[in-house]
């Protein structure tokens, strides 16, 4: 029975993933046609490669329709409810680093922690006649961090369809939860990260579907990739 490994379909994530695999002894033979999203691995007839977007890889791992995949931990934990029951992180690959953070306008000088934000949220409705609005693409992680971890309940998530960091300046939100690598885009939009506002430090990971976790072949592939990372 073959094993399906889903890889990012484009960009630096794809390039770096292919390099990690080659270091582990898995040379991916790319198709001649860029529209062909399947590939093979030299000398590994039972290992199928499938190229997908990083978000689709997270979904398919959750469904169990692929055995292994490379995607960001942020996408795994945002896309899948009860992620740890559905997938296992086999290895952190050392690239694609980014943090999911809570950021507020720099002019909120007295707001530096989540406790400060709790105070702001509590009286925001009284002052403004509405709940604190948070623009984000990460609604699951936001709810878990605000409601479950910090007990903040009085807020409203505004779905972000464009550049999340521009939402406060545009007036569509009061603050944001977004992903950042260097913080430069946040600073350019006059936003600051709260001192304890890092929700998740994410990076590209090798992830297995729990359905496939007992497969000896899946574990062998994961072990070889882990060993390659140590070279």
Swiss-Prot record:
Q: Mind telling me what this protein is named? A: ATP phosphoribosyltransferase
EC identifiers of the protein:
2.4.2.17
One Gene Ontology cellular component annotation? cytoplasm
- Which GO terms of type biological process are on file? L-histidine biosynthetic process
The entry's family comment says:
Belongs to the ATP phosphoribosyltransferase family. Short subfamily.
SUPFAM superfamilies documented for this protein: Periplasmic binding protein-like II (SSF53850)
UniProt source species: Brucella melitensis biotype 2 (strain ATCC 23457)
What are the alphabetically sorted keywords of the record?
A: Amino-acid biosynthesis, ATP-binding, Cytoplasm, Glycosyltransferase, Histidine biosynthesis, Nucleotide-binding, Transferase
Query: What does it catalyze?
Result: 1-(5-phospho-beta-D-ribosyl)-ATP + diphosphate = 5-phospho-alpha-D-ribose 1-diphosphate + ATP
Q: What is known of its domains?
A: Lacks the C-terminal regulatory region which is replaced by HisZ.
One Gene Ontology term of the molecular function aspect: ATP binding
Relate the assembly described in the record.
Heteromultimer composed of HisG and HisZ subunits.
HAMAP family with a match to the protein in the record: HisG_Short
Its annotated compartments are: Cytoplasm
Pfam families to which the protein is assigned, alphabetical: HisG
Is the Transferase keyword given for this protein? Answer: yes
The protein's superkingdom reads Bacteria
Write the gene name.
hisG
Q: What does this protein do?
A: Catalyzes the condensation of ATP and 5-phosphoribose 1-diphosphate to form N'-(5'-phosphoribosyl)-ATP (PR-ATP). Has a crucial role in the pathway because the rate of histidine biosynthesis seems to be controlled primarily by regulation of HisG enzymatic activity.
Write out the pathway annotation from the protein's UniProt entry. Answer: Amino-acid biosynthesis; L-histidine biosynthesis; L-histidine from 5-phospho-alpha-D-ribose 1-diphosphate: step 1/9
């Amino acid at each position: 029975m073959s094993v399906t490994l889903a890889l990012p379909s484009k960009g630096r994530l794809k390039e770096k993933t292919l390099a990690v695999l080659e270091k582990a002894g898995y040379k991916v033979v790319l198709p001649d046609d860029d529209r062909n999203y399947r590939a093979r691995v030299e000398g590994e007839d039972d290992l199928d490669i499938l190229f997908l977007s990083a978000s689709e890889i997270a979904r398919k791992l959750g469904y169990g329709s692929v055995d292994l995949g490379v995607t960001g931990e942020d996408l795994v934990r945002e896309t899948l409810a009860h992620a740890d029951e559905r997938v296992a992180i086999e290895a952190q690959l050392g690239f694609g680093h980014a943090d999911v953070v809570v950021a507020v306008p720099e002019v909120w000088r007295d707001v530096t922690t989540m406790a400060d934000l709790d105070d702001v949220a509590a009286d925001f409705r009284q002052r403004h006649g509405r709940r604190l609005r948070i623009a984000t693409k990460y609604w699951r992680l936001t709810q878990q961090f605000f409601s479950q971890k910090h007990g903040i309940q009085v807020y409203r998530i505004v779905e972000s369809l464009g550049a999340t960091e521009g939402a406060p300046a545009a007036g569509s939100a009061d603050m944001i939860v977004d992903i950042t690598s260097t913080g430069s885009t946040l600073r350019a939009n006059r936003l600051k990260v709260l001192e304890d506002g890092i929700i998740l430090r994410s990076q590209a990971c090798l992830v297995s579907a729990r359905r496939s976790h007992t497969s000896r072949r899946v574990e062998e592939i994961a072990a070889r990739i882990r060993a390659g990372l140590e070279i």
